[in-house]
Curated annotation (Swiss-Prot):
GO BP of this protein: ATP synthesis coupled electron transport; electron transport coupled proton transport
Catalysed reactions, semicolon-separated: a plastoquinone + NADH + (n+1) H(+)(in) = a plastoquinol + NAD(+) + n H(+)(out); a plastoquinone + NADPH + (n+1) H(+)(in) = a plastoquinol + NADP(+) + n H(+)(out)
UniProt-annotated location(s): Plastid, Chloroplast thylakoid membrane
Keyword NAD (UniProt): yes
Main subcellular location of this protein, as a coarse class: plastid
Protein name as annotated: NAD(P)H-quinone oxidoreductase chain 4, chloroplastic
Annotated gene: ndhD
Superkingdom of this protein's organism: Eukaryota
Keyword set, alphabetical order: Chloroplast, Membrane, NAD, NADP, Plastid, Plastoquinone, Quinone, Thylakoid, Translocase, Transmembrane, Transmembrane helix
GO cellular component, one term: chloroplast thylakoid membrane
Family per record: Belongs to the complex I subunit 4 family.
Record organism: Saccharum officinarum (Sugarcane)
E.C. number: 7.1.1.-
Amino acid sequence: MSYFPWLTILVVLPIFAGSLIFFLPHKGNKIVRWYTIAICLLEFLIMTYAFCYHFQLEDPLIQLKEDSKWIDVFDFHWRLGIDGLSLGSILLTGFITTLATLAAWPVTRNSQLFYFLMLAMYSGQIGLFSSRDLLLFFIMWELELIPVYLLLSMWGGKRRLYSATKFILYTAGGSIFFLIGVLGMGLYGSNEPGLDLERLINQSYPTTLEILLYFGFLIAYAVKLPIIPLHTWLPDTHGEAHYSTCMLLAGILLKMGAYGLIRVNMELLPHAHYLFSPWLVIIGAVQIIYAASTSLGQRNFKKRIAYSSVSHMGFIIIGIGSITNIGLNGAILQILSHGFIGATLFFLAGTACDRMRLVYLEELGGISIPMPKIFTMFSSFSMASLALPGMSGFVAELVVFFGLITSPKFMLMPKMLITFVMAIGMILTPIYLLSMLRQMFYGYKLFHVPNKNFVDSGPRELFLLICIFLPVIGIGIYPDFVLSLSVDRVEVLLSNYYTK
């Protein structure tokens, strides 16, 4: 057992070191870039060391615990700890954020502020995944809003202010319900508010109150995940944001909603989750079909990829709603798989858009001839997104399928119907992705247009793409490497769930 404050260092280091960026000399962007990369690499190395040598995979309980009193007035503690549910998300955050800072090298306007905001997001995300106090969880949840809003509103397309405003309105609206739920759980049945997750797990509520709390939290998570019909901010945001910001949004921010749904709704409110789970499965199945169909009608290829993210989130919702070991592990695997694939697709879309200055599919064609490397990687990650066997997307969706089929919660006919709907969604996915590839890369429309910007990927971009492609293939070939992180904790969570 380690008493060293590893998690506090991981939470504080990025934002503290990031604040020193403003004191660096204003001689170009090179110093700021390398400094930010160094901070991200140092954070990731500390993270990897701490988890390799101080985290026991076979122990399903909370590890690396830290508990310090922060505010005496209402018993607010700085409580941190991790388990198998949060370990994968923290490693994903470190990996994607490090590569997103590398992707952001072309940013030259206000680069110091840009990199500081990325590091501030980094701290908030690590803090959220390692929080063991519900109020601290809420604070870290809200810490994301300001950096993301500024990243969206200051760097992006022509309608970036509109998309940033839409994002802040949606997420702030959901946060109101989150705060009401936090206060309701903290004040119920006690004269002194207590928000320790360990205590709240053993807290029981009247059925009506538990349903109201569950619904309030669900609205907040439905915005971030997103769940239809609270998803409309996502295509606008991804259509306008800089591609390094899109990597953080698709790779990590959406996963915060899924993590909250498991950590709070499923773990703390089991009775309500049991009642809501059929509706979650139905919503997830509808979301897969709806988002895939809508994606097919998008002219903007960035928005087409954004709707594909909404569709893939449907598998996570179904896995969480299945209430089985297999289904929940599949949902966690899909969280990690889509974190890699979604972030890379937006990076590729952004780099292609920077070169072509075009985003509408009918204006494109023949890009594979001047840019064969971008074409190869775009095709490879599109195959991963449509769940090609041997890649992480296939394993994650297959495990969710098995989780739903083996669920004792549902009868045979509903399971067959939901499985049929999911299968239709999986058929629609290659249709909209392959049609996008055909319109962008095949033909001769842009091949004869002289353009000095039509250059292929450089070493920096290829290094980034290969770094993400390796875990996508690795998880597809040997998924037990990732499943071993969460399987014991999921078993404990569901055993407690059924006993309640």
